[in-house]
Structure formats: C-alpha cells, structure tokens
Amino acid sequence: MKAESIEIENVLRPGKTYRANREKYEAMREALVGVLPRSVPGFSVEEMIAAVKPRLPDALFPGGETAGWWVKAVQLDLEAKGLVRREGKPLRFRLAA
C-alpha cells in the first residue's frame, strides 16, 4: 500500500507546493511545534533537530534517520503558513505569537 501524501509549501518558493509523506510530516510537525519556543532567540536548525529526535516515533524515523531533512521541510512549510518565524543572523526559529 502506498503511503498517503500531503501538499506542503516552501516559504522560499511562494506559490509552489510539494508532496510529502503525510505520516512523517504530521509526526515531525507535532514534535517541532512541541519544542519550538515562542520567545526570542528561538532555536538554530541544529537545536531543532536535537530537540525533536527524542519525540519522533522510531517506526518512522529509526534512530533519528532523516530527521534533519524533515525538520527543514516542516519548518519551511510552517513558516510559509505563518506559524513559524525566522529571526536574525545566524538564523534562529520560533513559533509565531
């Protein structure tokens, strides 16, 4: 049986959507929203990856495999939807208020 897909956005490519595995997307979204702070300074990409790994189901992300790619994909999608904000340089990310 083929995995169900979901359309995701990329803040860097407005108007374009991409197909992604729904189950992995939803697991990563739940983990990412659960760890990202609302306040500045937020997390770096490396901090986001480290924070979500313990929250990911091993059946979908064995040993945290591919977590980095999925963190970035979900972060870009949530940013395009206005739910995540990027702050300063070096880049840091937080939940929108």
Q: Language model features by range: what are they?
A:
Residues 1-34:
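Long, low-complexity, charged/polar intrinsically disordered regions in eukaryotic proteins
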Residues 79-88:
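A short, conserved structural fragment
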Residues 36-46:
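Short capping segments at the starts of secondary-structure elements
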Residues 44-53, 78:
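A short acidic, leucine-rich amphipathic alpha-helix
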Residues 89-97:
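Short, cationic-aromatic polyanion-contact patches
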Residues 31-35, 51, 55:
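A general alpha-helix detector
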Residues 53-71:
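Short, positively charged loop/turn segments that connect secondary-structure elements
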